[in-house]
C-alpha cells in the first residue's frame, strides 16, 4: 500500500519547482520570499573546501546574472516532510555550464514553508573553487 502524499509534501515540491525555475530565470523575487532571513548556502568546492553565502549574498548572486535561454533543466529526486515542520528536498539543477546537486532544508515558520539551508556540489561541469 502506498502512503498518501501530504499537502505539505505537495507544497514543498512546488517550492522546489519554483526554486529551480527561479534559478534558471534569475528571479531574485522568488528567493526573497522563499528564503528564511537566516538562510545559509554552503558549496563544496572541487578541492574539498567549502564556501558560504547568506541570504543577501545569494540574492545578489541571482540578481547579478541574466536568465538562461530555453527551458530549465532539473529533476526533483526526493521530498521528505517530517512532522509537518521540517522538510528536505534532494534535486539536481542546471546552471550552465554546470549541473549542481542540491540538498535543500525547509522549515515551517508561521504556517509558511521557508528555505533555511542549501548544501550543494558540482555534479557536472567546471567545479567551483573559492
Protein language model regions, located:
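Short, low-complexity N-terminal intrinsically disordered segments enriched in polar/charged residues
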Residues: 1-29, 33, 37-38, 49, ...
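Surface-exposed, charged secondary-structure patches
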Residues: 4-11, 40-47, 51-99
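Residue-level detector of alpha-helical recognition elements and their boundaries
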Residues: 27, 34, 45-47, 73, ...
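Short beta-strand edge/turn micro-motifs at domain boundaries
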Residues: 99-129
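Short beta-strand segments enriched in hydrophobic/aromatic residues
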Residues: 35, 93-95, 119-120
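Beta-strand-connecting loop/turn residues
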Residues: 37, 84-85, 111-112
